[in-house]
Amino acid sequence: MLLLIQYTILFASILILVALGGCFSERSGVINLGLEGIMVMGAMGGALTMRFLPADIPAILMIVSVMLMSILTGLIYSALLGVAAIHFKADQTIIGTALNMLGLAAATVIVKAINIAANPDDVSSNVQYVEEKKAFIVNIGGFEFNWFMLTTLIILVAAYITLYKTKFGLRLMACGEHPQAADSVGINVYKMRWAGVLISGALGGLGGIVYITAGVSEWKFEYGVAGFGFLALAVMIFGQWKPWKIALAALLFGFFRALSNVYFGFEFLVDLNIPSGIYNMLPYVISLIVLAFTSKHSRAPKAEGIPYDKGTR
C-alpha cells in the first residue's frame, strides 16, 4: 500500500507540472499540444546533466542543477511554439504535433551522438544515472520521498497565487479570454502569450525529468514519455484549467498509472489474472471515458488557439 501511495504521488506530480504548463499556455490563448515533445527535451537536458556532473557533488547542487537544466531546455524548446504561433500566427495544432515528433527524434539523435563520441561501439539512446538519482530520494520509514514531490507542491501553490492573486496572472487570463479588450486597456497581448508559452515549456521540461527518474535509473530516449504529455492535457481539461482541480484530476490519473506498477503487490489483483497490459492501459482508457462525459461542460478560454492580430481590434 505504501508503494502505491508513493507512486501515485510521484506520477501525480508529473501530471500536475505538465498540466499546469499547458494551463498557463492556454490561459494566455495559445494551445500547446507539444507538451510531449517538451517533456522529452526537458528530460534529455536533465539526464545529460546528471550524466556529466560528478556523482559525489553535494545532493542539493545536483538537484538544483538538474532541475534548472530541465527547465531551461524545455523553455528554449517551447520558444519554437512561441515563434510559430505568436509571431507567424501559424496553426497551433499543427505546430504542437510537429514539436512532439521533432522532440523525440532530436533527443534520440543527440543522445546517440554523445554516446558514440564517448564509445564508438555504443549506438544506443540510453542515459544512465544510477548513483546520481540517489540525490533526489530520502527514505522516510520505508517511504521514498522524492524532492520533486515537494517542488510540485510549491509550484502548485505558486501557480494558484500567480493566476488569481497577481496582476500578471489576471492579465494573462484576460489575454486568453478577450485579447482585444486586454489590448484596449494597455496590456501587451503578445508579451503575455509569450510568457504563457515559456512558462509552459519550463514546467513541461521539469515534468520530463521527473518522469524518467520515477522508479528507473536509466532511460532510452527513443521510447519518449509514453503519452504523458497528452495525458496531462486530459488532466488539464478535466481540471477545468484551474490549478487545484488539476491537482485532484492528476491524483486520480496518477493512481491508475501507479496501479500498473504495483498491482502485483495486491494478492486479490494477482488472483484475477488480468494481463499487465490492461493495467498499463487504465489511465488512458479512464481519460477517454472522463473526457467523453465531461467535455460538454468544459469551458476553455474563449480565445485559445486564435492568433491575435492587433489590427483587428
Where do the protein language model's features map onto the residues?
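Transmembrane alpha-helical segments in multi-pass inner-membrane proteins
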Residues: 217-284
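Membrane-interfacial amphipathic/re-entrant helices at transmembrane-helix boundaries
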Residues: 1-19, 31, 45, 54-65
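Alpha-helical transmembrane segments within multi-pass membrane transporters and channels
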Residues: 58-106
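Helix-loop-helix "hairpin" substructures at the membrane interface of multi-pass membrane proteins
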Residues: 141-220, 244, 248
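Transmembrane helix-bundle core of multi-pass membrane transporters
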Residues: 103-165, 268-278, 298, 305-313
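Short, non-helical or kinked segments that cap or interrupt transmembrane helices
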Residues: 24-45, 64, 86-99, 171, ...
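Cytosolic-side transmembrane-helix boundaries in multi-pass membrane proteins
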Residues: 159, 177-184, 188-191, 263-313
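Hydrophobic core segments of alpha-helical transmembrane domains in multi-pass membrane transport
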Residues: 18-19, 43-47, 104-108, 149-162, ...
